[in-house]
């Protein structure tokens, strides 16, 4: 025996709030902090280790392939910065040292 539907369920109205933000500096604003700029230019491996450590991960993490991409994505997620993994990959692939400097400046500004 089936019963006819007497009333349709009512939809719930909700509002989605976006707490997204932007990077504090652009990828090519390398000269904003000359210390980070020089470190990123001449010893980017050391800067990558420092960024990883400042993010709360092991300083040896950048020795693993793809880990800097994971850290950049983690920074974006932690601070609700707009972007995508694809954008992160493109930045790191074509402007790796500048992107690393941006990550270091972001962590310095937010910590």
Curated annotation (Swiss-Prot):
Source organism superkingdom: Eukaryota
Family note: Belongs to the cornifelin family.
Protein name: Cornifelin homolog
Gene: cnfn
